[in-house]
Swiss-Prot record:
Keywords carried by this UniProt record: Calcium, Cell projection, Cilium, Cytoplasm, Cytoskeleton, Flagellum, Metal-binding
Protein's name in the database: Ciliary-associated calcium-binding coiled-coil protein 1
InterPro entries recorded: CLAMP
GO biological process, one term: sperm flagellum assembly
Name of the encoding gene: Cabcoco1
Coiled-coil intervals: none
Organism taxonomic ancestry: Eukaryota, Metazoa, Chordata, Craniata, Vertebrata
Tissues in which the protein is found: Testis-specific. Expressed in spermatocytes and round spermatids (at protein level).
Amino acid sequence: MNFSIEQYSKFMTLLDMLLHNLQTLHMSLEDSIKWLGEVMAEIGPNHSQKSEDFHVFEVKEANAIIDYLKISLFQHYRLYEFLFYSTREEIVIGTEQTIEVVKPADYPFPAPLEEGISLDTYSTFIEPLPTPDMEQKVLDQEQGTQEALLESEMREEDPLGGFTIDDVKSALERVTDEVLISMQKEISEKLQVQEEAFNARIEKLKKA
């Protein structure tokens, strides 16, 4: 139905009164249907002052409203009763967190394990600040490590230290000659095979 703004306002008033009767007056389904019938019975050409608020509806529109209430409010009346009357448990969703402050190092308990703690948290709250003595020890250790590496590198012998330039040249020439000789031999063998194959073909052509 295409209701006007005033008709929509009256319809919402009627629906609010039905819900008020259900929630506040605890009307049963039968009483609500009876009350609605009394209100709608006054709608028409000969309406009385009792239903003055709802005389904006025609009989056809009133029947459409009744049909709608049948499939909405009245069909689910028990559900609305449960909604208004039944007490429901209030569920409060929340979380509780217990935060333990890290005890000082001189406390008679072992320090907490570092596993499971992020590096930022450990560096900010747990790791002790370096003292000048500790910083000097770290620098000395780093310098000692670098000096040890340099000494070990200097002690390593050069694998070519016992050879002269002439020795290296002669070794390279010898290796080069061996490689070239093997390649020449392989090429000669392949050429010989091809030559024999060509000769055989020439002999066949002569005989033909």
